[in-house]
Design a protein with these regions (language model features):
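Long C-terminal appendages of very large multidomain proteins
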Residues: 1-222
């Protein structure tokens, strides 16, 4: 309860700050020659847009398939491509909305209700509703979510380049339950187990860091 109350209080403070800034900007409209870089929202938009367009606009699925070099795709590789498709779609939502918002801030287009929602959410440090709709469920604020976004992209890049990670960050997947189901399916193929009689279980290991693990297990994952 205290955690939610603190989040709500901080959100109200940010909202009040945003309104005060807007009021100040309105009063000082005569000083239109002020630098755009002085706008906190503009800085936020440009920073996130840089994340969304660097190093590339989206993952090239055809190239990823060639790099994997699998004649028959394993269940977990199928999941990887599904994850990449979802990530590309999410990235497109971020990129397109931020570019439109940047144009609106610069006065090139009008501010729609959707763009106004994105601007208000980012000003409060929240995740815009249209981003949430394309992303896995989350309670993260905008800053933490962007860090999560970058980290999951790093995992995908490593997965494409070097194969399935020795340690899989399930929290970085759009549908971790699908990956777990693929692990069960792969184990059943390898051991000739009946799929309908198999299940996943967890076990606590002595490892504390991903760097401590030398290789993936024969079945399952760390």
């Amino acid at each position: 309860h205290s955690k939610h109350a603190a989040k709500a209080l901080w959100s109200h403070v940010l909202a009040l700050q945003s309104k005060m800034c807007a009021s100040t900007e309105s009063e000082d409209s005569s000083h239109a020659n002020n630098s755009e870089s002085s706008s906190p929202l503009l800085a936020i938009v440009r920073e996130i847009l840089n994340v969304c367009t660097n190093p590339a606009y989206e993952f090239d699925l055809a190239n990823a398939r060639r790099r994997r070099g699998e004649t028959m795709l394993s269940p977990t590789t199928v999941v990887l491509f599904q994850e990449l498709e979802r990530h590309n779609a999410l990235k497109a939502v971020l990129r397109d909305s931020l570019r439109e918002l940047l144009k609106a801030i610069n006065g090139e287009i009008g501010m729609s209700r959707e763009l106004d929602g994105v601007a208000e959410a980012l000003s409060r440090g929240r995740l815009p509703a249209i981003w949430k709709a394309a992303a896995p469920p989350t309670d993260k604020d905008a800053q933490s979510w962007i860090a999560w976004f970058k980290q999951r992209e790093t995992q995908f890049e490593s997965w494409i380049e070097h194969g399935e990670p020795k340690v899989v960050w399930l929290g970085g997947l759009h549908c971790p339950e699908t990956y777990i189901a693929a692990l069960v399916q792969s184990a059943c193929r390898a051991r000739n187990w009946p799929l309908d009689a198999s299940a996943m279980y967890t076990e606590v290991t002595q490892y504390r860091r991903p760097e401590d693990i030398d290789a993936r297990p024969d079945i399952g994952c760390y």
